[in-house]
């Protein structure tokens, strides 16, 4: 934890008190895992506080430009402030927009930590409801936007609940986007996976399968999780 209610990482700070969805393990995993090395244009859909965009800015080449699209006005303003205070303020642009109407030059990499609660669940905070209900951005809207905005040789990287992975892969196939990498995320050794990190690319591909265990059986962070996140966490 850092100043105020935000998080201080090794190279940047994220305030998230005006964002419906807070900094969490899903976003940190995606920001550390997504394949950004060869990307020159990156899009973060539903950026929230800007966490993933800033993590990718830290990991990417100096000539990589990152656009972070966020629908909620308060979150977009806070993401803009977080980006402005970061070392990569010239490379990260926050755009307040619905992704369904957003237009831009195609991207080499599109990332998203999308909403995943189904309609019918209630939240006291309307902004949290908007951020997490699939009524705000459903899987087909998300993947249609990826199809429209992705460069021919680009990739999409997502983190989703395991229960949603089959739906995502079924819909993505309608847009000729298929799994390149399927990585199960296991919270603790011996447990079932509850999240999946997905990479999608154009055309049928050989899919690399693997897993990331966050905590070993004794409760300590696994070597793989430390390898992924140590460039970011202060005490790792």
Curated annotation (Swiss-Prot):
Keyword Transferase: yes
Record's function text: Specifically methylates the adenine in position 37 of tRNA(1)(Val) (anticodon cmo5UAC).
Entry keywords, A to Z: Cytoplasm, Methyltransferase, S-adenosyl-L-methionine, Transferase, tRNA processing
GO molecular function: nucleic acid binding; tRNA (adenine-N6)-methyltransferase activity
Domain of life from the UniProt record: Bacteria
Annotated InterPro entries: DNA_methylase_N6_adenine_CS, SAM-dependent_MTases_sf, Small_mtfrase_dom, tRNA_Adenine-N(6)_MTase, tRNA_adenine-N6_MeTrfase
Enzyme class, UniProt record, top EC level: transferase
TM region(s), chain numbering: none
Originating species: Aeromonas hydrophila subsp. hydrophila (strain ATCC 7966 / DSM 30187 / BCRC 13018 / CCUG 14551 / JCM 1027 / KCTC 2358 / NCIMB 9240 / NCTC 8049)
EC number: 2.1.1.223
CDD domains: AdoMet_MTases
Record protein name field: tRNA1(Val) (adenine(37)-N6)-methyltransferase
PANTHER family: TRNA1(VAL) (ADENINE(37)-N6)-METHYLTRANSFERASE (PTHR47739:SF1)
Gene3D superfamilies: Vaccinia Virus protein VP39
GO annotation, biological process: methylation; tRNA processing
Reaction catalysed by this enzyme: adenosine(37) in tRNA1(Val) + S-adenosyl-L-methionine = N(6)-methyladenosine(37) in tRNA1(Val) + S-adenosyl-L-homocysteine + H(+)
An annotated GO cellular component: cytoplasm
Subcellular localization: Cytoplasm
Similarity-based family: Belongs to the methyltransferase superfamily. tRNA (adenine-N(6)-)-methyltransferase family.
Residue ranges the record marks as coiled coil: none
Keyword hit for Mitochondrion: no
């Amino acid at each position: 934890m850092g100043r105020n209610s935000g998080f201080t990482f090794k190279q940047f700070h994220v305030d998230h008190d005006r964002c419906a969805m807070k900094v969490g393990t899903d976003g940190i995993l995606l920001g550390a895992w997504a394949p950004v090395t060869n990307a020159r244009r990156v899009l973060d859909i539903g950026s929230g506080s800007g966490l993933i965009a800033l993590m990718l800015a830290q990991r990417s080449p100096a000539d990589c430009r990152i656009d972070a699209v966020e629908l909620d006005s308060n979150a977009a303003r806070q993401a803009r402030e977080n980006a402005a205070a970061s070392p990569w303020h010239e490379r990260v642009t926050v755009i307040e927009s619905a992704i369904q109407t957003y237009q831009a030059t195609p991207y080499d990499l599109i990332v998203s930590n999308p909403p995943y609660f189904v309609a019918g669940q209630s939240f006291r905070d309307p902004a949290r409801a908007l951020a997490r209900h699939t009524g705000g951005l459903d899987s087909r809207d998300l993947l249609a936007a990826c199809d429209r905005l992705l460069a021919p040789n680009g990739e999409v990287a997502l983190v989703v609940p395991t229960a949603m992975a089959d739906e995502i892969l079924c819909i993505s196939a309608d847009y000729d986007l298929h799994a390149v990498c399927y990585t199960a995320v296991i919270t603790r050794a011996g447990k079932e996976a509850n999240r999946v990190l997905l990479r999608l690319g154009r055309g049928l591909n050989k899919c690399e399968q693997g897993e990331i265990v966050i905590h070993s059986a004794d409760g300590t962070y696994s070597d793989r999780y430390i390898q992924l996140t140590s460039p970011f966490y202060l005490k790792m």
